[in-house]
């Protein structure tokens, strides 16, 4: 049974999962405490995580979404995004996501309803 639930304390216990999306712990630290974290588990086994931050009034950003490699391409990431969009729909008019240029990630987000907006220089450095 799939369950998605928020994590309020000890978010760093999922550092191995978070580092699948962002290898630099210092970057994770920048958003982890101010963000809301969700874990997706299936049959009591953690499969995926995401962290959402409020960037401005009504503007939120998916800072991190990660699925353990052995569980990828099984719909867990898509379910987590669908949950997040539903969870924030009443307080969010814009949901952002920043990602690399991987040939898999942009089409994935587009298939989840996101529209490509622009390419930012040094996005992962600033």
What are these regions (language model features)?
Residues 88-101:
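Conserved GNAT acetyl-CoA-binding A-motif
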Residues 67, 81, 102-105, 122-126:
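Short glycine/proline-centered loop/turn elements that form peptide/ligand docking sites
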Residues 96-98, 110, 115-126:
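Conserved catalytic-core motifs of GNAT/GCN5-like acyltransferases
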Residues 65-72, 100:
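A short, internal acetyl-CoA/4′-phosphopantetheine-binding micro-motif in the GNAT/acyltransferase core
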Residues 28-32:
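Short loop/turn motifs at secondary-structure junctions and domain boundaries
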Residues 1-10:
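Conserved N-terminal entry element of GNAT/NAT acetyltransferase domains
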Residues 39, 45-54, 58-66:
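Conserved beta-strand in the GNAT
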Residues 71, 75-83:
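Conserved acetyl-CoA pyrophosphate-binding loop and the N-cap/start of the following alpha-helix
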């Amino acid at each position: 049974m799939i369950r998605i639930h928020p994590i309020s304390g000890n978010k760093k216990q999922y550092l191995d999962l978070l580092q699948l999306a962002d290898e630099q712990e210092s970057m994770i630290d920048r958003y982890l405490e101010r963000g809301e974290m969700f874990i997706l588990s299936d049959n009591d086994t953690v499969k995926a995580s995401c962290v959402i931050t409020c960037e401005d009034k009504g503007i939120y950003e998916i800072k991190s979404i990660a699925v353990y490699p052995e569980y990828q391409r099984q719909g867990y990431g898509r379910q987590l995004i669908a949950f997040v969009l539903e969870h924030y729909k009443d307080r969010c008019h814009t949901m952002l996501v920043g990602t690399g240029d991987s040939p898999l990630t942009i089409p994935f987000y587009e298939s989840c309803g996101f529209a490509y907006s622009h390419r930012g220089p040094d996005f992962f450095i600033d």
